[in-house]
């Protein structure tokens, strides 16, 4: 006998729609509230999602760190290159 999966499908669709609305609400300053963050946290907990378990991609961070060093070498303490200073004068 095959199980009816319509309830599971419905609950997944409901959960997805709720998550999409929460994500949209994060972009709306008037809707961002402690209650919204609490609801998002409960949704993540329900799915056993923990931000602490996320590992940063070393390759991306390494690239950003390298780019920052290159930038610092090209600009002075004021954040301007020699060309920038010349065009501002």
UniProtKB/Swiss-Prot annotation:
Listed InterPro entries: DNA_matur_Phage_T7-like (IPR024345)
Keyword Methyltransferase in record: no
Region of interest: Helix-turn-helix (HTH): 1-48
Keywords carried by this UniProt record: DNA-binding, Viral genome packaging, Viral release from host cell
An example molecular function term from Gene Ontology annotations: DNA binding
Residues that span the membrane, as ranges: none
Pfam entry (one): DNA_Packaging_2
Domain observations: The N-terminus contains a helix-turn-helix (HTH) doamin that is involved in viral DNA binding.
Family assignment from sequence similarity: Belongs to the terminase small subunit family.
Subunit annotation: Homooctamer. Interacts with the terminase large subunit gp19; the active complex is probably heterooligomeric.
Function summary: Plays a role in packaging a single copy of genome into the prohead. The terminase is composed of two subunits (a large and a small) and the small subunit recognizes a specific sequence in the viral DNA. Once the DNA is packaged, the terminase detaches from the connector and the tail replaces it to finish maturation of the virion. Packaging initiates by TerS recognizing the packaging sequence in the viral DNA. The nuclease activity of TerL cuts the viral DNA and the terminase-DNA complex binds to the portal of a procapsid shell.
Name of the protein in question: Terminase, small subunit gp18
């Amino acid at each position: 006998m095959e199980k009816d999966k319509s309830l599971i499908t419905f609950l997944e669709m409901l959960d997805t729609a709720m998550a999409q609305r929460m994500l949209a609400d994060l972009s709306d300053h008037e809707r961002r509230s402690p209650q919204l963050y609490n609801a998002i946290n409960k949704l993540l907990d329900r799915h056993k999602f923990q931000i602490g378990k996320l590992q940063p991609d070393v390759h991306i961070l390494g690239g950003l760190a390298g780019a920052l060093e290159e930038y610092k070498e090209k600009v002075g303490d004021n954040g301007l290159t020699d060309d920038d200073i010349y065009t501002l004068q």
